[in-house]
Amino acid sequence: MGKKKGGKRLTKRDIADAIQALFQAHPGETLSFKQIFKALKFDTHPVKMLAIDVMEEMEWDDWLSRVSDNSYKLNLKTQVQEGTFIRKANGKNSFQPDDGGKPVFVAERNSMFALNGDRVKVAFMARRQNHIKEAIVTEILERKHDQAVGILQVEKDFAFLNAEGNFFTSDILIPKKKLKGGKTGEKAVVKIIQWPSAESKKIIGEVVDVLGKQGENNVEMHAILAQYGLPYKYPKKVEDAAQKINAEISAEEIARREDFRDVFTCTIDPKDAKDFDDALSIRKVGKHWEVGVHIADVSHYVTEGSIIDREAEQRATSVYLVDRTIPMLPERLCNFVCSLRPNEEKLSYSVIFELDDDANIKDWHLAHTVIKSDRRYAYEEVQEILEGKDGDYADELRTLDTLAKHLRERRFKNGAVKFDREELHFDIDDNGKPTRCYFKKSTDATQLIEEFMLLANRTVAEFIGKAGKAKKSEDPNKPSKSKGKTFVYRIHDQPDPQKLENLRTALAPFGYKVKTSGTKGAISKNLNKLMEESQGEREQKLVETLTLRAMMKAKYSTHNIGHYGLAFDYYTHFTSPIRRYPDTMVHRLLTRYQDGGRSVNQDHYEELCEHCSQMEQTAQYAERDSIKYKMVEFMADKVGLEFDAHISGVQSYGLYCEIDDNHCEGLVGMHDLDGDYYEFDERNYCLVGRRTHHKYQLGDAVRIKVARANIEKRQLDFILAD
């Protein structure tokens, strides 16, 4: 038998691996024995004969196709698909097709050095006996990330970046002249200037920004943003353009608008909010209530195609980290010019409703308006008033609350799904350090605002969506209706039947019955029943999490399919143009159609919708990472302390435990569970001791000790204290 360099004999497995790698590197080519032997340096007769035997076996397995007596090619399925490459730290990479379906395994040797999130083209390999379905990357269509964030290490002759996250497969080499003054131990942003190839697996980059010392709050928050390709600085040219915008409201502009300056109007927002997108007005008109949903008229100040607009389009959304907001618009616009600040005349785009006492819509119209907010409320203030405390304009607020409750009751009666999940919040000191960690619950005050925003969003979407189904309106304040107007919808598809089946299987051991087929209303009613029945039970978090996973993700599109979760046939985002670019798009389209304009190019707007949906998801990833960071930072000085907790999640690698007092969650790794060897019972969501049969189940009360708080990796590790 032949030998490798160094004298080690080639085994049949060695030969098979070498042949497999060669054909996967040339997926569309026919290779002759001569080419194969030369490429793999199979020089001896025994090795060549063994190689031919191996290829015949691969042919029997349908892994290779024989082209002639002495040539083969890789047996690829005829179809080629495009999609996203998902890189895993454990090497179990996968390909997610664009058109949905299950992820397909991609071995590292078949990845073409694709990185996490890259758009790729793959060919599916014929499945060998007893092997899982596999794909091979044949082309990298688009790199998701062209920059990395990490810790610099500067050596005598070279430097490299130890990249954070799972985006990159290896350290990034940096020429010394491309360091931009960076030093060992500093965090930096590096732009990739050379990607891996068949000739070289090295990734080479250049430093574009030195963030600063690892562990400093600003450095870490900027690092999270940069890791996801999100901006943490505003271009000076855009800031300068914002400074030049005239904030004065002329008499001529006021004359063109409906005047609500003398009607009671207020904003209700989080106590630390600065950008006030929306305001509500209310007054009695005859037997009915006139409620105005007034939205900052961003499109009046931000001209389509301007430098400010291009930057906003690229960002697509404001990003909300734990201790800061990275605004979509320059600060002068979002916090001052456009913001509906109290006691200041402001331009708004409004949906004016005429409602009866049960919140039924008797009439409505769309109008460009001028308002003057009488009061800026925090949610907490309004909640106290709704609970009976005296306060400014208490009667008006309580009337709005009553109307909102009617709207909410009707919405759930019509099939909306109740997802009132608690959100984790932090109190932060002046240095960015978390001083308190707690859950924030939905209240009547937050639901009041939510219901009127939903009403406005649904109403304008329904109006455009039903275009052509009614005669042209004679009301000049309503958009002209013509068939087929391109519009931006917020859509949410029905749950995938397979996901519902998975939910049914997972919850069956707990006694819950999941409906996997039926009408939309029947399924949503069943999902609401699940969450109601699980309230206060130890598996409550599991039920909520798995039910949420069964739902599809909401997104933006010009192709309307309705919004399943809200039970609306038509829905859009109209109410937050300061922080969401789709809302600005909607404002412009409504104004265009209101003025009798023709429909816009649908393909162009669909591309914008896809971009905004992607940026929304990216922003959510960054927000979650900031929460993880602050959670670990909050617990860093508590290592060694014990806390009462409960099991909040069970996985094959350990137990997630949530501390009862502060809701911080950490992992008790399988290797830290003493006294037995524990196995994961996936069906019943528990760990079972092989010898003792002791079980760790969701909701079980436990006493934990904080073992490690790794801020750099954003990981919190616990051990059981008893």
Locate each region found by the language model.
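Electropositive polyanion-binding surfaces
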Residues: 38, 189, 194-196, 213, ...
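A short macromolecule-binding patch
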Residues: 102-107, 168-174, 663-680
